[in-house]
């Protein structure tokens, strides 16, 4: 048990962001997405499918969380999903060929949330590669984790979180760790 707790603590701290103190949060009217930076130094982008509905999102930062209100977006008949990416600076060499976990602390309010969690990145000469997704139902505060063996030729990696139902989502933490 003690060994498991030590290993869990080491994994939680490895290559991770400890809080989501978001700044420079702004809408990009040309690219039709939201962007921001976490105090920990990684980038955040929030887009919609279709892109033209990005301005229906209410995006803010409050109490150590990124807050995304998707209720107006999902009232539109052509609304499909919100794609949120966390471009976490990490030592990619430490992840190559390793079992890697994406971990997100999230809460859904004013609705029952549904999300897909991905490890997303580039490998070899491919532009985008999705290292599988895992669906989660979210209510209250949850910690969701998706683990995948990364290939040896991975070039970069990000956490992708698709928001699939109307709710007010609060994202408290996003982290990547490897065994």
Language model features with spans:
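Positively charged n-region of N-terminal signal peptides that target proteins for export
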Residues: 1-4
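Hydrophobic h-region of N-terminal signal peptides that target proteins for export
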Residues: 9-17
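Extracellular and organelle-lumenal recognition/adhesion modules and their flexible linkers in secreted
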Residues: 19-179
